[in-house]
Regions:
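Amphipathic alpha-helical scaffolding segments comprising HEAT/armadillo-like alpha-solenoid repeats
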Residues: 1-11, 36-48, 71-81
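Long, low-complexity, highly charged intrinsically disordered regions
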Residues: 1-27
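Extended interaction regions within the primary functional domain
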Residues: 12-14, 24-29, 59, 74, ...
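Solenoid-like repeat scaffolds
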Residues: 13-17, 46-54, 81-87
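Structural detector for internal amphipathic alpha-helices that build alpha-solenoid repeat scaffolds
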Residues: 22-35, 58-69, 88-95
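Short hydrophobic interaction/assembly module
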Residues: 43-73
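Alpha-helical interaction scaffolds
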Residues: 75-95
Length: 95
């Protein structure tokens, strides 16, 4: 299993191959299993910002539900100012 830092780096660099988002889903699971997902919150919002009109074939919903278990409001605000996204707007409406 990778370190938290390695997982976050992979999330930051992630690009779907031929529409396949499964590796991102695995990385999200690994990040939560490490027990301190808060350290990767900027990279998680970064996924929303890089793919602002996408839902990652459902993977973004896993990210959204995970983020909602954290202290995320300030990061959401910054993300929406930086690059508004479909998932960010959904999160704002859910507050």
């Amino acid at each position: 299993m990778s370190s938290t830092k390695e997982i976050i780096s992979e999330i930051k660099a992630f690009e779907p191959e031929e529409g396949n988002w499964l590796r991102l889903d695995e990385l999200i699971t690994e990040l939560w299993e490490k027990g301190n997902p808060q350290v990767g919150i900027k990279e998680l919002f970064g996924i929303f910002e890089r793919y602002p009109k996408d839902d990652g074939f459902g993977v973004f919903w896993s990210i959204l539900h995970g983020i909602e278990t954290l202290e995320y409001e300030q990061n959401l605000y910054e993300s929406l100012l930086n690059n508004p996204s479909y998932m960010g707007i959904i999160m704002l409406k859910r507050i």
